[in-house]
C-alpha cells in the first residue's frame, strides 16, 4: 500500500511539473522517439513522432562535473544495478566499501539507462535521495525519481536520439494564444543567452498578434531568472493552458519550432543487461562538496539522476539479455565481490552521482 501511495504521489508531482513547464526551442525527430534534456531547466522532455509526450524533472551535473552537452544515443538498460564505486571516490570515502548492491541504499536506484558513448560514463537513472530532484548536483549523470526512471526505462527505446541542450530561456504560446516567457539560471556560467535575438522574436510575435508587450516586463523576467513561467500578454492570475507551442526564438522569428523531418527509424531492439550488472560512476574531478545550485522556483516532480559508466572488460558488454525481473526485486552482488552495505544515515551527497 505504501509503494502504491508513493507511486501515485510521484505521478501527481510529475503531472504538476508538466503543467507549469515551458518547452524549449528544439526540432525533435519527426519519426520515432527523441529525448531532450535542458540543463538550465532541469527537465527531460520526451517526444514521440515529433510531439511532446512527457516531461520529467531531473537533476543534472554540477559545474565541476557537468553533464556532457550535445547529441547522444540511448544505450543499454540495467535493472537493479550494482554500483561499483570508482577508485577516486573509494579513496575519498576511505571506508573500504567497493560496491553497493541493489536496494534502498543504492544511489543508482532501480534502473540505469546508458546515455551516449559508454566512455562518457553518463546515464539516466533513479536515486536513493529523491529530494535532490530537480537540481544541479550530480557527478554528470541525469538523475530521476525512481518511479519516473522506471517508467522512462520501460518507454524509451535503445538507439533513440538524445539531445542535451543549454537554453537559458523558453518562449511559448499557449492554447489561449497568450505569450509566456521563462528565464533560467546559468549553472555552468556559459552566459549564452542571446537577449537581442529573444527580444526580436517577442517583438515579431507581438506585431503579428496586435499586442503590446512592455520592454521593462521582459527585462525584469530576464534579470530575475526564477525559472517561473510569466505571461507577457495576460492579466495576473491567468493560468498557463496546454498545449504549448515553442517559438523559434533562437532564430529571432515569430515562427513556431517544428519537428525535423527524419526517415522512419528501423525497429529498435532493446538492449537489457543482466540483473545486477555492475555500473561504475566516474567522478575523478568532483571532490568539491560546494552547495548545489539553487533550484528554479517552478519545481514539478523531484527527480534524481546519477553518473555511472559501464565496467570495461568485466561487464557483459551492451548485449541483449533475458527480460528483467520486476524492479522491486533487488539483485544480489556477485559472491566474488564482498559488499559492505552503506547505512541510510550516510551523507547522501557522497552517494549521489
Tell where the protein language model's regions lie, with residue ranges.
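Compositionally biased, proline/threonine/alanine/serine-rich low-complexity intrinsically disordered stretches
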Residues: 247-353
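Short, Lys/Arg- and Gly-enriched loop/turn segments at beta-strand edges
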Residues: 170-177
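Positively charged n-region of N-terminal signal peptides that target proteins for export
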Residues: 1-4
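Bacterial N-terminal signal peptides
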Residues: 7-15
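Short beta-strand-centered segments at strand-helix junctions
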Residues: 138-155
